[in-house]
């Protein structure tokens, strides 16, 4: 298992990785192995709430600041899933720690990203607790975020990759200024499509009539029609007025993905070594 962990880290280095949030599974080999591993890589390990109980200091840097095309992006790491078997490390309240770090970096950066390792129940309050963040990426739950899922209108937006890395979240942000909110146009477009499908299904039953004539006297359906049309119009207005935008999609890591031959060779060799070690 320690070999597996080390080659996963080598794989991250090969494909490119800006930071690793230390959570539940990073402690799979024990705290000593984690610290040794963190010292062998150029990838920053981050955590804003894991404390060395012997020194009462943070175990890792709480965040990193990444610069991309003139933008400064703060990435803050948090967890509340520290294994009980870990003795010399404690996890301080991750909400309190997260808010403290947001306050510390918000005037220094353009975008704040939270990496949060927490169970599903604790993830439900993250957008309310971290309102000054822009993006929240979670682990620790098998839930998968889809574009149509409800999100706060102006963020922060929360995304989860689901079970066993079967998908990868891809989030593209276009930032034209630093004052307007970031608008999730993927949600607005998905909402429009969903409401249009409802109208189309109703229309298919009576193709030669208007919806008003077809469902005359059926108050519930007429109300649904009105709500769907209003939602489509409102989404269209928001799309046209959006200045800073976010596009989100899940990419399935299936056979349609074309393998990078160098990475494929590395993975195949590593798996073969793992199998040899098992035997």
Please describe what each predicted stretch is.
Residues 1-279:
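Acidic, metal/ion-coordinating pockets
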